[in-house]
Amino acid sequence: MIRLTYIFHSGFLLETDSCILIFDYWMDPSGVVHRCINRSKIKPVYVFASHFHEDHFTREIFTWKEDSLESNYTYILSKDILKRRRAKKEEADVWMAKGSTWEDELIKVTATGSNDSGVSWIVEVDGKCIFHAGDLCNWYARFLEGPNPDQEIYSEEFGEHFNPVTEEKRFLGELKDIRKITDSFDLMMFPVDGRIGNGYTLGARQFIDRFKVGMLVPMHFTMSGFESAWRMQPFCQEKGIPFWCIG
């Protein structure tokens, strides 16, 4: 049994027969976390944070352990959170960077790369392989449509100079590294963020072109609306991939 519940933005709670996984918690408008954990108090809870950005990590997650004497929590965090001094070393059970692995008797975790901050996650649990992208995405896709995409430009929005072609190569390079580990996921959670502009589905499309995916779950669309995430559905249908509609 796998039960996936959307929390908010890039946050999800995944419950299996043996445990509960919580990814990139930011806020919980519907009270998902406490409701699900209270229903399954005997199951161990694994809490993941892929990087330090405030929409993927909040110190509130540490209060769950303090407030619950019945549940067993394991905190698995990206090392950039420690480097940015957003958390103390002793507050997490496991600190991970790209290429590191960790496992116990229930799950195996591999930290894969990101072309933004921190890591993405491969989690093997109860015979299933799960992928959470964190902030791994083709964020500069709209600039690839310009007359000179292979040229450094300045974005006031991002406040930096960048080369769209170089940035896309970084993203595709991370996908290549992930394929060295596995080319198949039962469940994939990936950014489909309309704020990127034209081509905002490109990163997710490039991913499903390279991997076997049992189900695609969009995320990181809070500011652009549920409808923007649905734009991925036709691309998934073309490939026979189930699409998880949120909203």
Task: Identify the meaning behind each predicted range.
Residues 11-15, 119-122:
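Short acidic loop-to-beta-strand element that houses the catalytic metal-binding Asp/Glu
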Residues 13-52, 59-67, 136-181:
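Pre-active-site segment of Zn-dependent metallo-hydrolases
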Residues 70-130, 242-247:
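Metallo-beta-lactamase
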Residues 3-6, 21-24, 107-113, 129-135, ...:
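Active-site-proximal beta-strand elements of phosphoester/diester hydrolases
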Residues 18, 42-44, 70-72, 127, ...:
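A general structural motif
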Residues 22-26, 43-59, 75-80, 131-135, ...:
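Active-site neighborhood of phospho(di)ester-bond hydrolases with catalytic His/Asp-centered motifs
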Residues 5-10, 74, 86-102, 176-179, ...:
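Binuclear metal-ion centers of metallo-dependent hydrolases, dominated by the metallo-beta-lactamase
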Residues 28-30, 53-57, 81-85, 100-102, ...:
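Active-site environment of divalent metal-dependent phosphoester hydrolases
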